[in-house]
Amino acid sequence: YSPDGLVGETGSIEVKSRAPKKHLATILADEVPAENMAQIQCGLLVSGRLWCDYLSYCGGMPMWRKRVHPDPAWFCAIIAAATNFEAVVADITNTYTEAVVGLPATERIDYTEGIVI
């Protein structure tokens, strides 16, 4: 997790630069856009921070801030998704490992070797 900033010992910030239409919609709704909430809640989960200030801005318009606190329901959903992802990756890895047993390895050619930019 890489927050846009840490605030004191307990807070963090996430800053989004928005197009005017999106920024206006955020201000009028007075809530963090759904597409950003997973990022914020995941950040709170892994960092242990107590809050995150979500900042939305668009040049020439007022900056908007909303303080977000940890949400146990989000934490459960994030942990469940991560656990499921780990199981899927482990299954794919095992399937691949079994499928390639005894197959000959091929040479990998690096066509960019020697190119200097």
Feature annotation, model-predicted:
Residues 1-117:
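Accessory terminal regions of nucleic-acid processing enzymes
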